[in-house]
């Protein structure tokens, strides 16, 4: 979705329009440097129209993070449900990484730009981690028929750490990502996921 074209006031999609415009800005500039006026300009509306839906810039950031976290969890749930019992976890993790690449701006805001911005942002990130961990433990259980609760929890934590690190590396395009190239990077992430989920792999 693009932010070209002026929207009539109070249209039902107007709030989402603000979130998407803000996400584009937060992904390319430090959020503390972005103003409500900047968001309004990007969304092609007035600052008053932004304040109609949000009390502050921080609330827009929180809503953007909350929307991404919900979509990320839903995507992982779908991947886990589709996972065949006994199949490898690498493909599931790389599929989630590919989805985040398709939603790069939102992923950048969630994993990079919003870090340390506010207590609410950190609380949202922690809540998301807890939810993702639950799904990753389910994924481990589907891939390994005989795994103890403790081992599934540890493996799930390992997958969560890998996912967060890989997502951050990908959206930043850091030295590791650039030196490997996209295909090799994704392949390495998949192989690591397999070793984490099943050390005997």
Residue spans for each PLM region:
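N-terminal intrinsically disordered/low-complexity leader segments
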Residues: 1-13, 20, 24, 140, ...
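C-terminal peripheral helix-coil segments that are non-catalytic and often amphipathic
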Residues: 1-3, 98, 102, 134-142, ...
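Helix-turn-helix
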Residues: 13-17, 21, 25-59, 63
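Pre-recognition alpha-helix immediately N-terminal to the DNA-recognition helix
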Residues: 17-25, 71, 91, 95
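Alpha-helical DNA-contacting segments of helix-turn-helix folds
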Residues: 61-68, 110, 124-125
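Hydrophobic alpha-helical connector segments
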Residues: 63, 77-105, 146, 155-159, ...
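Amphipathic alpha-helical packing segments from all-alpha helical-bundle domains
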Residues: 70, 119-144, 153-157, 180-191
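Short secondary-structure transition hinges
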Residues: 98-137, 172
